[in-house]
Design a protein with these regions (language model features):
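Membrane-embedded catalytic cores of phosphoryl/pyrophosphoryl-handling enzymes
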Residues: 70-197
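Hydrophobic alpha-helical bundle signature of multipass membrane enzymes
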Residues: 1-79, 87-91, 95-102, 106, ...
């Protein structure tokens, strides 16, 4: 089996941070960080892109209605295609990157882009590792997220935003992850692990 305890723990924690409550907290804290910089346009871009991503994601899931693989004790209840974690993980990270990069020195931009790509790929891989998605769901999520980011990039090229100070946004992101970890993951970890047990072990 490809399942190992330390990988289970890593991917389960990562995937739990991609559910609605943690992502909502992340979105709210970054919005506040942008508003505290009095950068209303950048805040509007942030919120608008996230809402567009969520709307398209839910619409496609309901329209395609593709069932998930039935390989774990308690598969998520939503439809499989496209992967919501993959889509919104890419949209959140990509939008944050588009907003932050102009305020980052050039020599650090490649490092940030590499880190974002690795994290987005790892989020997608977590859903495959936990066997709650088909590979096509992940591909669909990457394509949908990429299309949304391409639209945002085009808009920003036509109507640039005032440079954002990146560190408050990064701090807001880290705060959201830590709060979410100790609010929605750690206290319920035993039950969460049970959901992802392979059927042969549940």
């Amino acid at each position: 089996s490809l399942r190992h305890r330390w990988l289970d723990d890593f991917f389960i924690v990562l995937t739990q941070l991609g559910y609605r409550a943690p992502m909502t907290l992340w979105g709210v804290l970054v919005t506040l960080a942008l508003l505290l910089q009095r950068n209303t346009y950048a805040a509007t871009l942030w919120v608008g892109t996230l809402l567009l991503g969520q709307t398209l994601l839910v619409g496609l899931k309901q329209w395609i209605a593709w069932p998930r693989p039935n390989l774990v004790a308690m598969p998520p209840e939503s439809w499989a295609f496209p992967s919501g974690h993959t889509t919104m993980g890419l949209v959140f990270l990509g939008t944050l990157t588009i907003l932050c990069l102009p305020g980052v020195p050039g020599r650090r931009q490649k490092a940030i882009l590499s880190a974002v790509c690795i994290l987005a790929t790892t989020i997608a891989a977590a859903r495959l590792y936990l066997t709650v998605h088909w590979p096509t769901d992940i591909l669909g999520g990457l394509l949908l997220g990429g299309m949304i980011l391409a639209c945002l990039h085009t808009l920003v090229l036509q109507r640039p935003f005032r440079t954002v100070r990146p560190w408050p946004l990064i701090a807001a992101t880290l705060a959201a992850w830590v709060i979410s970890l100790f609010t929605w993951v750690v206290p319920h970890y035993g039950d969460i692990v049970h959901r992802y047990l392979p059927l042969s072990l549940s």
